[in-house]
């Protein structure tokens, strides 16, 4: 027996030792990684807040559970009772400590400056305070409820389940004990009812999201009343605990056991509470909704519809949208086109998918290099703004030949991608391929475009951090890294950056080997005192590790500046707690701001965080929580700031929401008389919504007639009426300089028919010359793909442009073969955009 006991203690010691080393290794790996990013305050804030909240919750839960269990469990040792209480307290501490960031937001909140229309409370209460108080109330309720259940079980187990023993179990002491706990539950429930009043601002009962007539005039007073009823019920339980609760009524003795009569009085109180609650908070509001509101819905719900419109527009950043009539004027002419060459020279003829396929065929160079995505940006070249598309040439170790996928190659040799490929959006070679500004390995500027050399020079092309970079590598070691493959040899390099964690000591290697489950880290002779360990290099994982509370755009993009490469991220603050703001289907939030721009060095992995929207109350709270992390946007170097763009993900949400919430008149909104939608396009016989497009264009003149002569980078999406195909408006987000973030909507006259994208596509498909030519191509072993139809505003008119790609059925090299252009009721297809415009706007004899 003694030997068995020693064995058990040994196993317990070994298990605790393994847990301790695992925890220590994980903490050190995090500590070193955050130190590398100069973000240690972020880690320490997280650790202190989580453990501090957990410790406070543990002590409070231990006091509640321990005092109750010890007072009722007479047959147990004091140590045993406290052991059970400790186990329960650890559970409750862990559950509450997960809400540490809710606590920090509550402690660091600030006023929003806008109040809700029902309670007249600053919206900061709903964004910061209400989530914290609700979390605390739920936690306290569950703590007391579980304590009550534990106490009941202890009384029952201690004295058995016979009627005689149940009577003993429910002695006066036990009755008082249980009633005190029951009263405490009802007191916490009264607190919960009081908080539920504020939840009415997120009601879905009425015609719109948020509190409606029935909520305000029936549910709100009923919930307030229920808070008082729950409080009185708690007082009733405590009064019974003080006075005694057994009901000695003569008619009860014939059918009610003596132990059950002890439960009758609290059962009556509990039943009365439930019945009153069902009548007041469920039945009464439903009767008001059915018999009063529904027959008079618009009249009674009008003020609440107005609130929903106002707060939804505010929640999605649509309150300041500038709506203008699209200027009317003469027809689009050749002369007007010549005056808008900045727009025409940036018409995007390359779609992302065919361009990516072409990049992969022509520029990946080696199987282990991959282009994951194509991105859009703009550069000022030769004094003009030029829109470009590019893709990072990343290293995907999964594509290395299987025989070469050794541990040494994974950790030391294949360490980084190399450079990028970049081409203008509007230039096509005679072979129908993109004409590169920047290409090859090492990155080379095309001699045909010497003016881009100073802007697009890449002096540090190595990509140690990227979207496909999932391996952890050692750099600065004895082994040489592959820099890039040359014609007949490999060019080697050694990392000279500041990224990664130095691991000069054996104990550090031991902790990393333990954490990553890789003993070879400890045993490898390739490591030296100069070695640095680069881990968590996948850029999305890397940035989320630092700030998991932000929502990130799906499209990070690469920027060339000063010979170096940087990853740009758009990050959003979101909340589901904005009163009256309507959710979009499938999205959990009803408030969103693009409040943060993050920039990551692709060579060193360092991250800089910039506040792009200082008016956002959420990012201001974040900045108070992490005062050393965020910088003002003005601190971003000006050359980098020129590459900020309005994010597509946010724009999609705003455009979708504005399709309904451009209607600000409650009657118009209620009847959905002017509902819009994003037009569709057909791809593979399936209709999908059009995606917003980045364009460089000159915006139309303003309502005062002042002309705009400056080309700018904008994000644009058209609108059509619901169940119709004509175009009624378009929305644009400005991306440049002091106009960044401004949203413009241009509405067309309702007396004027404007062809929508779907109508133009239908006319393209019905054109006999175009459809005949497409059929001929499809019959000769080729596959024809129509690209995205672009809607291009030019002064007082709209021009439609659609590229056409051909690729062999056996190959994957799309070629841009034709360009389709349309204006009003004319459609043409020509080899180039210039020829298509000539065919549209020049008489035959003058071409």
UniProtKB/Swiss-Prot annotation:
Species this protein is from: Synechococcus sp. (strain JA-2-3B'a(2-13))
Recorded superkingdom: Bacteria
Glycosyltransferase in keyword set: no
Family: Belongs to the UPF0182 family.
Name the UniProt record assigns to this protein: UPF0182 protein CYB_0372
Keywords assigned by UniProt, alphabetized: Cell membrane, Membrane, Transmembrane, Transmembrane helix
Regions that span the bilayer: 7-27, 51-71, 76-96, 141-161, 168-188, 220-240, 259-279
Keyword Cell membrane (UniProt): yes
GO cellular component: extracellular region; plasma membrane
Localization terms from the record: Cell membrane
UniProt cross-references to InterPro entries, sorted A to Z: UPF0182
Bilayer disposition of the protein: Multi-pass membrane protein
């Amino acid at each position: 027996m003694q030997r068995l006991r020693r064995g058990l203690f040994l196993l317990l010691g070994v298990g605790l030792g393994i847990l301790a080393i695992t925890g220590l290794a994980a903490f050190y790996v995090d500590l070193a990684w955050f130190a590398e990013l100069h973000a240690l305050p972020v880690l320490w804030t997280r650790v202190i807040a989580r453990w501090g909240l957990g410790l406070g919750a543990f002590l409070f839960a231990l006091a509640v559970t321990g005092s109750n269990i010890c007072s009722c469990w007479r047959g147990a040792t004091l140590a045993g009772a406290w052991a059970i209480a400790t186990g329960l307290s650890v559970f409750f501490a862990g559950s509450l400590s997960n809400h540490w960031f809710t606590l920090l937001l509550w402690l660091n909140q600030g006023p929003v400056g806008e109040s809700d229309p029902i309670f007249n409370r600053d919206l900061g209460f709903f964004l910061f305070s209400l989530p914290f108080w609700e979390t605390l109330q739920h936690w306290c309720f569950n703590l007391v409820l579980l304590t009550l259940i534990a106490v009941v079980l202890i009384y029952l187990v201690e004295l058995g389940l016979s009627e005689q023993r149940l009577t003993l179990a429910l002695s006066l002491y036990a009755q008082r004990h249980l009633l005190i706990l029951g009263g405490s539950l009802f007191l916490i429930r009264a607190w919960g009812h009081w908080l539920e009043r504020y939840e009415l601002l997120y009601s879905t009962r009425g015609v719109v999201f948020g509190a409606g007539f029935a909520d305000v005039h029936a549910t709100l007073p009923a919930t307030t009343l229920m808070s008082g009823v729950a409080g009185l019920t708690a007082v009733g339980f405590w009064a019974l605990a003080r006075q005694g609760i057994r009901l000695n009524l003569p008619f009860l003795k014939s059918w009610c056991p003596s132990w059950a009569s002890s439960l009758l009085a609290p059962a009556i109180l509990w039943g009365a509470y439930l019945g009153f609650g069902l009548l007041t908070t469920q039945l009464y509001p439903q009767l008001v909704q059915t018999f009063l509101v529904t027959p008079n819905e618009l009249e009674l719900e009008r003020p609440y519809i107005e609130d929903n419109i106002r707060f939804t527009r505010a929640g999605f950043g649509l309150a300041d949208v500038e709506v203008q009539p699209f200027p009317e004027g003469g027809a689009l002419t050749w002369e007007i086109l010549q005056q808008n060459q900045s727009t025409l020279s940036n018409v995007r003829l390359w779609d992302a998918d065919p361009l990516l396929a072409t990049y992969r065929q022509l520029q990946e160079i080696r199987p282990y290099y991959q282009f994951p995505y194509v991105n859009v940006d703009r550069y000022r070249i030769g004094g003009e703004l030029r829109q470009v598309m590019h893709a990072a040439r990343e290293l995907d170790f999964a594509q290395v030949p299987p025989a070469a996928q050794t541990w040494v190659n994974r950790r030391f040799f294949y360490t980084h991608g190399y450079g990028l490929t970049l081409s203008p959006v509007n230039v096509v070679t005679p072979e129908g391929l993109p004409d590169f500004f920047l290409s090859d390995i090492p990155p080379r500027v095309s001699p045909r475009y010497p003016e881009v050399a100073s802007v697009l020079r890449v002096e540090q092309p190595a990509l140690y951090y990227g979207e496909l970079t999932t391996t952890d590598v050692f750099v600065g070691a004895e082994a040489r890294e592959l820099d890039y493959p040359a014609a007949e040899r490999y060019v080697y390099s050694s990392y000279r950056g500041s990224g990664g964690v130095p691991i000069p000591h054996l104990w550090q290697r031991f902790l990393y080997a333990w954490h990553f489950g890789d003993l070879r880290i400890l045993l490898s002779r390739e490591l030296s005192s100069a070695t640095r360990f680069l881990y968590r290099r996948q850029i999305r994982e890397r940035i989320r590790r630092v700030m998991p509370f932000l929502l990130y755009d799906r499209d990070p993009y690469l920027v060339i500046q000063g010979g170096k490469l940087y990853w740009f991220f758009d990050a959003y603050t979101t909340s589901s707690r904005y009163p009256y703001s309507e959710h979009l289907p499938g999205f959990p939030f009803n408030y969103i701001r693009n409040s943060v721009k993050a920039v990551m060095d692709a060579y060193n992995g360092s991250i800089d965080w910039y506040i792009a929207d200082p008016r956002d109350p959420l990012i201001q709270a974040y900045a108070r929580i992490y005062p050393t992390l965020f910088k003002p946007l003005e601190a971003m170097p000006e050359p980098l700031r020129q590459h900020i763009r309005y994010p597509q993900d946010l724009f999609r949400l705003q455009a979708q929401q504005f399709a309904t919430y451009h209607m600000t008149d409650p009657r118009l909104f209620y009847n959905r008389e002017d509902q819009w939608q994003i037009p569709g396009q057909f791809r593979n016989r399936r209709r999908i919504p059009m995606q917003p497009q980045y364009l460089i264009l000159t915006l139309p003149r303003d309502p005062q007639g002042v002309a705009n002569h400056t080309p700018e980078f904008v994000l644009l999406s058209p609108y059509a009426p619901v169940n119709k195909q004509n175009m009624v408006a378009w929305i644009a987000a400005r991306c440049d300089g002091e106009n960044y973030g401004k949203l413009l909507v241009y509405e067309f006259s309702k007396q004027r028919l404007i062809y929508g994208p779907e109508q133009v596509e239908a006319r393209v498909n019905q054109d006999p010359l175009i459809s005949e030519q497409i059929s001929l191509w499809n019959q000769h072993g080729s596959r024809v793909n129509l690209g995205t139809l672009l809607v291009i505003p030019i002064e007082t008119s709209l021009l439609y442009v659609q590229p056409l790609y051909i690729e062999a059925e056996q190959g994957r090299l799309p070629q841009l073969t034709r360009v389709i252009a349309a204006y009003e009721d004319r459609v043409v297809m020509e080899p180039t955009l210039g020829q298509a415009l000539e065919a549209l706007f020049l008489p035959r004899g003058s071409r």
